[in-house]
Amino acid sequence: MAEDKKKAPKDSFFKGVISEMEKTSWPTKEEILKYTTIVIVTVVFFLIFFYALDLGIGKLIELIS
């Protein structure tokens, strides 16, 4: 049954991990810089958008009250 199966040695696991890491295509430095810039610009855009929205709603509530 399940107890009868031999367990794979630890080095077999690490060899598998290394093998899979070698198959992975890693982004280049330029790609990382490009994607990081896109993320930062997007975050800043939404920061400004929601800040302006918050100010607008605050002023609207102030006018109503």
Swiss-Prot record:
Keyword hit for Repressor: no
Keywords: Cell membrane, Membrane, Protein transport, Translocation, Transmembrane, Transmembrane helix, Transport
Subcellular location: Cell membrane
Gene3D superfamilies documented for this protein: Preprotein translocase secy subunit (1.20.5.1030)
InterPro entries given in the database record: SecE_bac, SecE_sf, Translocase_SecE/Sec61-g
Pfam families: SecE
GO MF annotation: an example: protein transmembrane transporter activity
Superkingdom, natural source: Bacteria
Reported function: Essential subunit of the Sec protein translocation channel SecYEG. Clamps together the 2 halves of SecY. May contact the channel plug during translocation.
Family the entry assigns: Belongs to the SecE/SEC61-gamma family.
Description of how the protein assembles with itself and partners: Component of the Sec protein translocase complex. Heterotrimer consisting of SecY, SecE and SecG subunits. The heterotrimers can form oligomers, although 1 heterotrimer is thought to be able to translocate proteins. Interacts with the ribosome. Interacts with SecDF, and other proteins may be involved. Interacts with SecA.
Protein name listed in UniProt: Protein translocase subunit SecE
